Amino acid sequence: MRDPLTDCSYNKVYKNLKEFSQNGEDFCKQITSILQQRANLEINYAKGLQKLATKLSKTLQSAKKNCLVSAWAWVSEGMKSAGDLHQKLGKAIELEAIKPAHQVLSAHEKKRKSLENEVEKTANLVISNWNQQIKAKKKLMVSTKKHEALFHLVESSKQITTEKEKQKLLNKLKKSTEKLSKEDENYYQKNVASCSTRLKWENTLENCFQSILELEKERIQLLCNNLNQYSQHISVFGQTLTTCHTQIHCAISKIDIEKDIQALMEETTVSSTENKSEFLLTDYFEEDPKNAMSKERQTSSIKSKLLRLQKDIEKASRDQEGLERMLRAYSSHSSFSDSESKKSTAALMDENSLKLDLLQANSYKLSSVLAELEQRPQPNHPCSNSIFKWKEKQTHSSVKISRPVLMKRLENVVNRASSDGQRIPSPSSTASGVTQLGNGLCKALYPFQARQDDELDLEKGDIVTIHKKKDEGWWFGSLKGKKGHFPAAYVEELPLNAGDTASQA
């Protein structure tokens, strides 16, 4: 059975981060285990030194007091002091490094299990909806074939049956029509419901991605803190451990926590240029050119389905316009809106836009069949190159809809580090995945509500100056004096001479 989740960009990034996180957890556990062994060695060594110091002290008590005995007494005191020092080091490692590490690892494990269960739950909903659609389609196809056979039986029996038998057949046909209508509606509703199910799964992946990312940052910070504590306690050993400590301190002084976080972000950044979500399209018996239906009945049935789609498309378009107006109102009058309202409205608009694309793809597919039946030219639609067919006992159709990937990017961390006063080298203009531009322009096709501090708010028709194009589907530019990121899928790039026209205007 085809897996609808395998090729999803969100899923790939989430799995890569999970693997990275697991490696980090294993590393942290190994470091903690080694520290525990070191603490045990220090405590056991301290006990041994203290026993020897006590034994030497008792020996000296029975000896005659002289300079030699006094010197050995200092040796005994030195052993006691060294024992205390090693014991304090062992206890400090246990208290300040091992205990916090166990607490963090335990909390992380519980959190990760909860996140993984949430992702698995929503993924199962997507797969269940996918399978339910195929099941409902199979059931609808069988019922349609039976209905057509009954219809032909009624048509062929008009002249040779009595009124009573004819009425009986008509009653059967009526029941069959009602049953067929219910199954058709059930199949259609499952297809439409796939939008919200898919979005819920992708939003869960995005939220879990951010949560695991925060856990990784916390783990990196923990290891850095442990190293600093270790360095402080080793340094009190005195001059005899200076050489060893210098090497450790030199290594610790080279630690750059922001560099580690930057490496983490680079490992987990979205590598695909766009995110494509695949949805099943409705496939009806009437679309099969080899079916037994007459062209008139095929045409009539397809037109009724197109009418239903058109009504839903018009409703979705009105909803989209309403949501756009709402977002514009939020931007213009910030006093009666908050970030959660804006985020919720933007999410609704994203879902509605996706639903509209699916409805239009279904409408285009049926319109193409209708045009072929009526011997008219085939209609044109942007999604025509994104519709695919494959066979698994039956022929299935699906569409891949392009959408921007909204996960947090590496620049967020770079900007945050810069604001803290730490300079992070900027990537070269020829680095992989980045295109440096002069003053290229693009025009906003749809409104976009910023979800992060480093993103731009877009209104339909805005002209944005492009500074950089990133491979993960986000561009960097400026609008009305503000610089930030925006999704490339929401804009169209203008020709180079448009810059002169815009500047003259």
UniProtKB/Swiss-Prot annotation:
The modification Phosphoserine is found at S114, S478. Keywords: Cell membrane, Coiled coil, Cytoplasm, Cytoplasmic vesicle, Cytoskeleton, Endocytosis, Membrane, Phosphoprotein, SH3 domain. Residues 1-260 form the F-BAR domain. The keyword Lipid metabolism does not apply. Gene3D superfamilies: 6.10.140.470, Arfaptin homology (AH) domain/BAR domain (1.20.1270.60), SH3 Domains (2.30.30.40). Residues 101-128, 160-222, 295-332 form a coiled coil. GO terms for biological process: endocytosis; signal transduction. It is found in: Cell membrane; Cytoplasmic vesicle; Cytoplasm, Cytoskeleton. Present in pulmonary arterial endothelial cells (at protein level). Residues 292-372 form the REM-1 domain. Homotrimer. Interacts with DAB2. Interacts with NOS3, DNM2, WASL and CAV1. Interacts (via SH3 domain) with DNM2; this interaction allows the recruitment of NOS3 to dynamin-positive structures. The SH3 domain mediates interaction with NOS3, DNM2 and WASL. The F-BAR domain is necessary for membrane targeting. This is Nostrin. It comes from Bos taurus (Bovine). The gene is NOSTRIN.
